[in-house]
């Protein structure tokens, strides 16, 4: 059985940067917390907890210490509160997310109604939305955008993990809604590259394994993209979840991982697949 690992599997630039910053802060010791999970990888969050860094839902109970801002960013009000409390802030917000926040802020100040393409329940989107001082709408698809009211000036940004296709569909729908539209391409290339590569790989193999947190939006999207081309696609968080039955009659296995999946988790999965393959051949 041949195992092919996607070249772009695992940490993207923003996640790598955020985890490095978090582990460096943890090494310094002292009271250190992250505001929400640093990235959407329960295993990385657990490692940080073992080093004494706990994830907080909010900073209302914090009076001193270091607060690490998660890679997805946080609401502007929470950042202001951290500054007011004079906490030491380690801002690990992904620069691409930061860009989307800044666009929303400036569009809003310039009198545009803002449309954010994304998942309203996702912390990244909730953070981006908080930078709007005027009207702001969150839509998940072109169909949802078609239900928006008429607006004079529309500014569009996207959650960084959205597909380019979805952004285009929303923009098409917005063209019928306003006289002036400004669109900022805030989708991260790492997401698009991973999806394209995963599609290509899924079409060449008999079974596809996608590794990453069940709470990771980009990993879930990878699994969806792969399933369309290879129904035998399995989304797992760690090696122990691999089932030998999945590999029955399989000649080629494709493996990819979300942008918040650490290399050590990918390595463990590859080792376990190798072990299953050996047992199968005995």
From Swiss-Prot:
Question: Which pathway is this protein engaged in?
Answer: Isoprenoid biosynthesis; dimethylallyl diphosphate biosynthesis; dimethylallyl diphosphate from (2E)-4-hydroxy-3-methylbutenyl diphosphate: step 1/1; Isoprenoid biosynthesis; isopentenyl diphosphate biosynthesis via DXP pathway; isopentenyl diphosphate from 1-deoxy-D-xylulose 5-phosphate: step 6/6
Instruction: State the reactions this protein catalyses.
Output: isopentenyl diphosphate + 2 oxidized [2Fe-2S]-[ferredoxin] + H2O = (2E)-4-hydroxy-3-methylbut-2-enyl diphosphate + 2 reduced [2Fe-2S]-[ferredoxin] + 2 H(+); dimethylallyl diphosphate + 2 oxidized [2Fe-2S]-[ferredoxin] + H2O = (2E)-4-hydroxy-3-methylbut-2-enyl diphosphate + 2 reduced [2Fe-2S]-[ferredoxin] + 2 H(+)
What job does this protein perform? Catalyzes the conversion of 1-hydroxy-2-methyl-2-(E)-butenyl 4-diphosphate (HMBPP) into a mixture of isopentenyl diphosphate (IPP) and dimethylallyl diphosphate (DMAPP). Acts in the terminal step of the DOXP/MEP pathway for isoprenoid precursor biosynthesis.
Catalytic residues at 124 (proton donor)
Q: Might you give the EC number(s) for this enzyme?
A: 1.17.7.4
Report the enzyme's class at the first EC level: oxidoreductase
Q: Which residues bind isopentenyl diphosphate?
A: 40, 72, 122, 216, 218, 260
Q: Which InterPro entries match?
A: LytB/IspH
Q: What is the lineage of its organism?
A: Bacteria, Pseudomonadati, Thermodesulfobacteriota, Desulfuromonadia, Geobacterales
GO terms for biological process? dimethylallyl diphosphate biosynthetic process; isopentenyl diphosphate biosynthetic process, methylerythritol 4-phosphate pathway; terpenoid biosynthetic process
This chain belongs to the protein called 4-hydroxy-3-methylbut-2-enyl diphosphate reductase
From which source organism is this entry? Geotalea uraniireducens (strain Rf4) (Geobacter uraniireducens)
> Gene3D superfamilies, alphabetically?
3.40.50.11270, 4-hydroxy-3-methylbut-2-enyl diphosphate reductase, catalytic domain
Binding of dimethylallyl diphosphate, residues: 40, 72, 122, 216, 218, 260
Q: State the Gene Ontology terms under molecular function.
A: 4 iron, 4 sulfur cluster binding; 4-hydroxy-3-methylbut-2-enyl diphosphate reductase activity; metal ion binding
What NCBIfam families does this protein map onto? ispH_lytB, PRK01045.1-1
| Entry cofactors | [4Fe-4S] cluster
Task: Please share the entry's free-text remark on the cofactor.
Answer: Binds 1 [4Fe-4S] cluster per subunit.
Specify which residues bind [4Fe-4S] cluster according to the UniProt entry for this protein. Answer: 12, 94, 188
Pfam families, alphabetized: LYTB (PF02401)
Annotated residues that bind (2E)-4-hydroxy-3-methylbut-2-enyl diphosphate are located at 40, 72, 122, 160, 216, 218, 260
What are the record keywords, sorted?
4Fe-4S, Iron, Iron-sulfur, Isoprene biosynthesis, Metal-binding, Oxidoreductase
Protein family (similarity comment) = Belongs to the IspH family.
